[in-house]
Amino acid sequence: RKNVFANLGFDSFTSEEYMSEQDDTNPNDWVRDHNLTKYILQAMESTEGPDYVYSISVQGHGDYPEEPVLENPKITVSGASSQAENYKWEYYCNQIYEMDQFIKELTDELSKLDEDVVLVMYGDHLPTMGLTVTDVKNKYLFQTEYVIWDNMGLEKQDKNLAAYQMAAEVMDRVGIHEGNVFRFHQARRNTKNYQVDLEMLQYDILYG
């Protein structure tokens, strides 16, 4: 990731081993998400101008235990196909609960800033629980929800977006139209030859 993010244009990269809170972990030894708040704010305060901060959380990762490991779970689960499945879902749901608390903490802190902020949150995959298409409401195993929070009063919109369209969509909504790829997504996303032309643009940038 250190090399990848540098090649993507990021000025700095802070990995887990450089965080003083790396020992604040859940029972699966994943660092708890709330530790990210400090580092996100530090990154935003590191410059006087606007910042583009990309943060990766890990608390909700598996494998999920098939026996009880939480002393006082906020959420209890029953009704799964087995007791082991109950414990797995119970563990996962309680991690989600803690992650929700982190999001509240983060948005509370961001709302105090005297600058425009847009926060985009999404999961890059469903939990590793052996899910099938019959287990999910939309019948798609490779789609996840995204949420956009802001302190600018942007109008709420519901759009079905590919991951590679998200950044261009957000930038479009805040009036930023810089970069050939962003401008292409913003202007051509709903046109007939969008995917073919996008492939040609990518080829030209990489090899042209």
Model-derived regions: residue spans:
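Solvent-exposed soluble domains appended to multi-pass membrane proteins
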Residues: 1-208
